[in-house]
């Protein structure tokens, strides 16, 4: 399985096109990337959690799009590392619950090793939260399992400015519940980001099997 890191920000709609092609040919890979500012609503979205009108937001450079993934509204923006595993669960004989639990555990272990952060899950609200303050969310999750081939994934807040998050109640919560590595006073620079990605590769490898060398691309 290839791991690909994009050096340039990938438009969200471009990613949606990519994921459909990957699913069609059941081509496994794991993508690491950032998006330009966008708000997305999952299949369980509550309209009241979009605090400003779609037309106004788009006039401010924040796109709004509705997608086939679990969850409510969330946001993507520069400074947030998005990890999209595309995994053939049928071929690998992996139960959905096992996949989700191990995906989150990979993030938990990688964050602990990289920054000494202790993160926990919340059975009532998907994502990862600080163990020291369980109201503070640092990682969002939303996955699609169409045809037992995964798409979408997790979004980990490194040093994003939360401009897009201010326009929603992310997953029904107040945007001020969101935090990031930078807001916690920790190093969110390039070297630490690369270290986190390396640990993610190792942890994903532990339950998905052999993963090839990380590939960098500018497309």
Curated annotation (Swiss-Prot):
Organism superkingdom: Bacteria
Gene Ontology terms for molecular function: lipoyl(octanoyl) transferase activity
InterPro entries: aa-tRNA-synth_II/BPL/LPL, BPL_LPL_catalytic, Octanoyltransferase, Octanoyltransferase_CS
GO process terms (BP): protein modification process
Compartmental location: Cytoplasm
Described function: Catalyzes the transfer of endogenously produced octanoic acid from octanoyl-acyl-carrier-protein onto the lipoyl domains of lipoate-dependent enzymes. Lipoyl-ACP can also act as a substrate although octanoyl-ACP is likely to be the physiological substrate.
Protein name as annotated: Octanoyltransferase
């Amino acid at each position: 399985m290839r791991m690909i890191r994009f050096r340039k920000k990938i438009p969200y709609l471009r990613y949606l096109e990519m994921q459909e092609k990957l699913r069609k040919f059941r081509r496994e890979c794991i993508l690491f990337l950032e998006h330009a500012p966008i708000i997305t609503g999952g299949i369980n979205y509550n309209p009241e959690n979009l605090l400003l009108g779609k037309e106004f937001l788009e006039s401010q450079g924040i796109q709004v799009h509705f997608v086939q993934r679990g969850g409510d509204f969330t946001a993507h923006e520069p400074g947030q590392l998005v990890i999209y595993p595309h995994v053939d669960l049928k071929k690998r004989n992996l139960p959905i619950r096992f996949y989700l639990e191990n995906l989150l555990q990979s993030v938990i272990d990688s964050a602990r090793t990289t920054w000494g952060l202790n993160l926990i899950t919340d059975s009532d609200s998907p994502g990862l939260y600080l163990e020291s303050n369980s109201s503070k969310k640092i990682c969002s999750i939303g996955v699609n399992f169409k045809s037992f081939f995964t798409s979408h994934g997790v979004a980990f807040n490194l040093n994003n400015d939360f401009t897009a998050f201010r326009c929603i109640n992310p997953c029904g919560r107040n945007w001020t519940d969101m935090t990031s590595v930078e807001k916690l006073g920790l190093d969110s620079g390039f070297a630490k980001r690369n270290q986190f990605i390396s640990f993610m590769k190792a942890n994903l490898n532990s339950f998905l099997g052999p993963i090839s060398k990380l590939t960098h691309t500018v497309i």
